[in-house]
Amino acid sequence: PRPDKVAPCVTDRQVDLVIRWGTEHDSLGTVEQFTMNTKGELFTYRGSIAERADGGYSLAVEQSKYCDLAKDVMSCFLKTQALNVRGTRARYIEYRNVRSDVYLRAVWNPDLETFQSRDMRELYDQLMKLIPRD
């Protein structure tokens, strides 16, 4: 069943928070994107970068797990501050809260393992564990 309430760790100012991550394939013009809202609902979109959307509902993450992940994402952004290293493929993590006008995005080349991208790569792997294998 889909959750009908936001996770208990979510404040009034965080209700609209969205966490996104995925891989953009610039040469193909495609993206594989995952979006998680404050209810812990996970949405998947695979397709054209130009037509990007939140995608279809995939699953609901346990709300305690959501709280841990949201905290980890914010901590990682506070630690990393800025990361924008693109290649023909680019991995990314976004933290977006429209209500408080916060938009954070880290982008890195998954074909390179740089010191600067280490924390984001680890966080990306942690987020990808939520995605069921096809």
Give short role names for the model-derived ranges:
Residues 1-26, 76-134:
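Short, well-ordered, aromatic-rich surface patches in folded extracellular/luminal domains
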Residues 25-37:
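Short, solvent-exposed loop/hinge segments that bridge or flank secondary-structure elements
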Residues 28-30, 53, 87:
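Residues that act as N-cap/strand-start positions at coil-to-secondary-structure junctions
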Residues 31-33, 56-58, 105:
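Well-ordered beta-strand positions in beta-sheet-rich domains
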Residues 38-42:
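Structural signal for glycine-centered tight turns and loop->strand junctions in beta-sheet-rich domains
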Residues 43-79:
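A short-motif feature that recognizes glycine-rich, charge-decorated loops
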